[in-house]
Amino acid sequence: MSAKKRTASSARWMQEHFDDHYVKLAQKRGLRSRAAFKLEEIQQKDHLIRQGMTVVDLGAAPGGWSQVAVKLAGDNGKVIACDILPMDPIVGVDFLQGDFREENVLNALLDRVGEDKVDVVLSDMAPNMSGSDGVDQPRAMYLVELALEMCHQVLAPNGCFAVKVFQGEGFDEYIKSVKQAFKTVKTRKPDSSRARSREVYLVATGYKL
């Protein structure tokens, strides 16, 4: 993508962002990002998080999903969040800053989880987009593979998984992998997800491995 096209695309995104209904609603409700509404919509349909549950939130910054998760899990629940970017503290959220593709960060995250298994793994991770599908799609698929691997390491039997996936090369194969690990897998496109985005969310329940 040329610099000129990238600048035009960035300007269009900024205009859409500030005109966006969900951006304005997030600001009104004190939510850190419009992404919070995606998890709220998923929760309304699939009831993933309940009081007292332990939740891992991957790609958490700036904290929209963690805000929703900690409210749903309640005082007796636990939310462990991780992102390569910094995130302002949220009461009830144990946040680890680091790139969990790196072994030392992954080990630190597993230490936070401890010996007990978790009930829900959330992933809203996305790579820094270059504008080239040949570069961006493999990066995105690598992240969702890591999120599924996290499920294999920490998720309790019958646990749940919600992950953002970009449709493209590797998408169908990934769905097959998720279906092998969970009893039920649904594809969701929340209303708050921009229509032109290739992102969808796989919502998997009944972890069975």
Swiss-Prot record:
The keyword Electron transport does not apply. One of its GO terms (cellular component) is cytoplasm. The keyword rRNA processing applies. It is an enzyme of class 2 (transferase). It catalyses: uridine(2552) in 23S rRNA + S-adenosyl-L-methionine = 2'-O-methyluridine(2552) in 23S rRNA + S-adenosyl-L-homocysteine + H(+). Its EC number is 2.1.1.166. It comes from the Bacteria. One of its GO terms (molecular function) is rRNA (uridine-2'-O-)-methyltransferase activity. InterPro entries: RNA_methyltr_RlmE, RNA_MeTrfase_FtsJ_dom, rRNA-MeTfrase_E, SAM-dependent_MTases_sf. Keywords: Cytoplasm, Methyltransferase, rRNA processing, S-adenosyl-L-methionine, Transferase. The active site is at 164 (proton acceptor). It is found in: Cytoplasm. S-adenosyl-L-methionine binds at residues 63, 65, 83, 99, 124. It holds the Pfam family FtsJ. Belongs to the class I-like SAM-binding methyltransferase superfamily. RNA methyltransferase RlmE family. Specifically methylates the uridine in position 2552 of 23S rRNA at the 2'-O position of the ribose in the fully assembled 50S ribosomal subunit. This is Ribosomal RNA large subunit methyltransferase E. The lineage of its organism: Bacteria, Pseudomonadati, Pseudomonadota, Gammaproteobacteria, Alteromonadales.
